[in-house]
Amino acid sequence: NLFYSISDIERVGDHAENLVESVEYMKDRGIDLTESGIEDIRQIGAAAVKSFDHAVRARQYNSMDEVRKVGQYEDEVDNLEEEFREKHVERLSNGECNASSGMVFMDIISNLERVSDHAYNLAGYIKDEM
């Protein structure tokens, strides 16, 4: 399980790198997100970070309570991703944003959701060891 844990942690690093590349892409091309889109990213990002933080704590303290928290945050992130994709389609339909900013927005929330998925995997390995 430790080998799989290391692999998931490495994948989280890959997603973090993807997030940096998305921001650099926006900066280089002068792409801006709507305030609503930025707030959506803040919200899903905070939940994804919490899921990973609880996965680290679950490993550190061998805590089933922390494992459960990872699951709760992972569910929240999944729900937020679905909600924010729908909101994004509405913003596109209303002309509030364009295809370029929309592509970056979708990439960002997808990468954040994958961080949460890997946190959930980590929690699962810990649960299996208990």
Task: Please report, for each region that a protein language model flagged, where it lies by residue.
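Cytosolic, long alpha-helical scaffolding segments
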Residues: 1-130
